[in-house]
From Swiss-Prot:
Superkingdom, natural source: Bacteria
Ranges for region G1: 12-19
Function: An essential GTPase that binds both GDP and GTP, with rapid nucleotide exchange. Plays a role in 16S rRNA processing and 30S ribosomal subunit biogenesis and possibly also in cell cycle regulation and energy metabolism.
Protein name as catalogued: GTPase Era
Keywords: Cell inner membrane, Cell membrane, Cytoplasm, GTP-binding, Membrane, Nucleotide-binding, Ribosome biogenesis, RNA-binding, rRNA-binding
Lineage, top ranks: Bacteria, Bacillati, Bacillota, Clostridia, Halanaerobiales
Domain Era-type G: 4-170
Alphabetical list of Pfam families matching this protein: KH_2, MMR_HSR1
Region described as G3: 59-62
KH type-2 domain residues: 201-278
Membrane topology: Peripheral membrane protein
Subcellular localization(s) per the UniProt record: Cytoplasm; Cell inner membrane
Family: Belongs to the TRAFAC class TrmE-Era-EngA-EngB-Septin-like GTPase superfamily. Era GTPase family.
Amino acid sequence: MSYKSGFVSVIGRPNVGKSTLINNLIGQKVVITSPRPQTTRNSVRGIYTRPEGQIVFVDTPGIHKARNKLDNYMLEKAYESLEDIDVIIFMVDGNYSFGKGDEFIYNQIKGVRVPVIVAMNKIDRINKEIVMERQKNYEERTGFPVIPISASRGTNLDTLVEEIFTFLPEGPQYYPEDMVTDQIEQFVVAELIREKVFILTREEVPYGVAVKIEEMKERDNSTMYIRANIYAEKKSHKKIIIGHKGKMIKKIGRLAREEIEKLLQTKVYLDLWVKIEKDWREKEGLVKRMGYKG
């Protein structure tokens, strides 16, 4: 039996479940998630391997209207992910019929020369009759095959994977079978910290936050020491992140440390600092300094 492999770009509107899908397929958290849209800022690769083949998933920032330099960067990364790939997963929210946001993305991909599969997510929230109705609606509007799934519950993910493999070419194993992401540890650690800020803070605060790992080294007692700066755009945001008597930053640190220890399989001392970098999302130089490089 021939070995198949290829690169699969997962695109869609913000908060349709792209990161949840990849994490569930890989069986490990390689992409951060939160209930808020636009959590993902970089294109992240998740690697799915089985004896007969390998799929390299590329999770992308949600496609939306750009409002600042950071948004421009995120959209650039989303569109870059469509280059040199073998299959596109166009992810949509099954709670809704085909809408303007979906149409905008459809217009970007309808002319591509690679197979497109529509993954209609969140079917666990709607009854079977509506699932069938929405599936037909998306098939008629796009002309692509539509697979109803629940990324969070794992429903029909095996069907989606089989459909992807039918379109993949014969190819090499790009990554070792025990590798689940190509991202360096520092990137993943910074993202896990940022995820906790996203989940625990409110309103516009998380969108103006960046996390930069300043130091990461193993100590003599086999503990990993990590010093990270959390950058906020405003003094008021810094206060919210720190919280009353430091309660919020302690909670962010505790929850992030628990996940980082799972990732690194070692005890972690997480040293978090909150700093102000005014309007960094508006300045290209600062966007790059925060690690979002083109």
